[in-house]
Curated annotation (Swiss-Prot):
PANTHER family: 30S 40S RIBOSOMAL PROTEIN (PTHR11831), SMALL RIBOSOMAL SUBUNIT PROTEIN US4M (PTHR11831:SF4). SMART domains: Ribosomal_S4, S4. One of its GO terms (biological process) is translation. This is Small ribosomal subunit protein uS4. Residues 96-156 form the S4 RNA-binding domain. The keyword Ribosomal protein applies. Pfam families: Ribosomal_S4 (PF00163), S4 (PF01479). CDD domains: S4.
Length: 206
């Protein structure tokens, strides 16, 4: 499956906000020009139409979670079939991806790095190797680092970085054992306030 492998700052600048695609806890402004869009005329940010605002929000969320367009639309369709608010269901499905849970537990410093750990068979789910980043984690599942991968320097560094971030209330992590439990699905209040999932619902409802 195709993945974007270009400069991650360009994506954050395109959306005008930090998409947390880089490792570390420094704000985007200290890493690249956050205020300007990429390109020769990046300083010019025109006024967007309602459709443009909705599209940008969808692109922002899609890039945060590293999901391609077709897959993102499928997530939306699944979310619409679940009882409750479609937008909130969409975010919960994205949060339940294995690569995202690995990131939330601190084993990867970014979602891209976490996706690589999963693809390289460094992650176990309930004691079994799973190498599918989109694998949907269930409440109560135990996520752990494979024994032969536990001494990887990047995992050690990632756990150190994760210790500087805000606590993730819906996972319980044992950093010494390098394993964690997906305790519950996150509530909407647990997730970033700067995401407006209702704009995505409006976009796909047209």
């Amino acid at each position: 499956m195709a993945r974007y492998i270009g400069p991650t700052c360009k994506l954050s600048r395109r959306e005008g906000t930090d998409l947390f695609l880089k490792s570390g806890v420094r704000p985007l402004e200290s890493k690249c020009k956050a205020e300007a869009a990429p390109g020769q005329h990046g300083q010019r940010r025109g006024r967007l139409s309602d459709y443009g605002v909705q599209l940008r929000e969808k692109q922002k969320v899609r890039r945060i979670y590293g999901v391609l367009e077709k897959q993102f639309r499928n997530y939306y369709k699944d979310a619409a079939r679940i009882k409750g608010a479609t937008g909130e269901n969409l975010l919960k499905l994205l949060e339940g991806r294995l690569d995202n849970v690995v990131y939330r537990m601190g084993f990867g410093s970014t979602r891209a790095e976490s996706r690589q750990l999963v693809s390289h068979k460094a992650i176990l789910v309930n004691g079994k190797t799973v190498n599918i980043p989109s694998f949907q984690v269930n409440v109560g599942d135990v996520i752990s680092v494979r024994e032969k991968s536990k001494n990887q320097l990047r995992i050690q560094n990632s756990l150190g970085i994760a210790g500087q971030r805000a606590d993730v209330e819906w996972v319980d992590v044992n950093t010494e054992k390098k394993e964690g439990v997906f305790k519950r699905c996150p509530d909407r209040a647990d997730l970033p306030a700067e995401i407006n999932e209702n704009l995505i619902v409006e976009l796909y409802s047209k």
